[in-house]
Structures are given as structure tokens and as C-alpha cells.
């Protein structure tokens, strides 16, 4: 199974990339993690709908057919660590690859958000996108460690 993290926005601070890379290399070979950064649409005088459409096109191009789409959304379902671990286990048993989508500064196209298989929320707080990448990969690693009985997660 592969976890594909699709993030709108290419540039993150060095500390965030270092942290992301550290967690990404910890995953076992049977659970591959890949990051695809897609270009943020330049604002200029474009309407929000135009921005959404351009970013949606790039996001959809980054996600292979047959992949389960999970969007990160402030209105999504909040999960505990144990609940995310169960979700990860369910995804693995389902056999499909999973794309977790992080929207751009303006969020995600509402129709794309609605069409996703799932909508989850990492926090009730508004977080910078670099922090979301790090938080998401850490929580996915933690969920894996819960399922694997690895000592990383402690109760």
C-alpha cells in the first residue's frame, strides 16, 4: 500500500522538510509514503473559482486512478490517535492506495472536497501548511506504530 501526500504549495522551510524527511524514512517497506507538491495558482486578479479550478486540476493529475482520496479539511472528522490507527489499518486491509490532500492557502475546491472519500481534520486550530505536512506525516507514523506495536507511541 502507498500513502500519497498531495500538498498544494512547493516551498516549505528547511526545518519542515527535514522533519518531514525524518518521519518519511521511518516507514516500513510495505507502507510506502510519497509526497507530491503541486503548484499554488498565482492569485493576481483571478476569482476564487478560477484558483480552485486550476489547483484542482493539478491535484487530480497527481493522484493515480483508483486511489482513495482523503482531504484534510477544517470541517472534517476529528480523529484521535487510536482512531487514525484504525483508519490506517482499514485502508491497508482495503488494499487501495490512499491520497491525503492538503489544500492551498485558499483551501480546496468545494466540489473536490465533497467528492472525496473522506474528510478529516488534524486540529481545531488553523495551522501553517509546512506545519501540516510535518504533523500529518508524524501522525501517520504514530498510527503505524500503534498498529505495529512499536514503542514510538506510549499510552
Curated annotation (Swiss-Prot):
Its main location: cytoplasm. GO terms for molecular function: rRNA (pseudouridine-N3-)-methyltransferase activity. It is found in: Cytoplasm. Keywords: Cytoplasm, Methyltransferase, rRNA processing, S-adenosyl-L-methionine, Transferase. Specifically methylates the pseudouridine at position 1915 (m3Psi1915) in 23S rRNA. Homodimer. This is Ribosomal RNA large subunit methyltransferase H.
Amino acid at each position: 500500500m502507498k500513502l500519497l501526500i498531495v500538498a498544494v504549495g512547493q516551498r516549505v522551510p528547511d526545518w519542515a522538510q527535514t522533519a518531514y524527511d525524518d518521519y518519511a524514512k521511518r516507514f516500513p517497506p510495505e507502507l510506502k509514503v510519497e509526497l507530491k507538491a503541486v503548484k499554488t495558482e498565482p492569485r493576481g486578479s483571478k476569482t476564487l473559482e478560477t484558483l480552485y479550478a486550476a489547483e484542482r486540476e493539478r491535484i487530480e493529475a497527481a493522484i493515480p486512478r483508483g486511489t482513495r482520496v482523503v482531504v484534510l479539511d477544517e470541517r472534517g472528522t476529528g480523529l484521535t490517535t487510536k482512531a487514525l490507527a484504525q483508519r490506517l489499518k482499514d485502508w491497508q486491509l482495503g488494499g487501495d492506495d490512499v491520497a491525503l490532500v492538503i489544500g492551498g492557502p485558499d483551501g480546496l475546491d468545494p466540489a473536490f472536497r465533497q467528492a472525496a472519500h473522506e474528510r478529516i481534520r488534524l486540529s481545531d486550530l488553523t495551522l501553517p501548511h509546512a506545519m501540516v505536512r510535518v504533523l500529518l506525516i508524524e501522525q501517520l507514523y504514530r498510527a503505524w506504530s500503534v498498529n505495529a506495536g512499536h514503542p514510538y507511541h506510549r499510552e
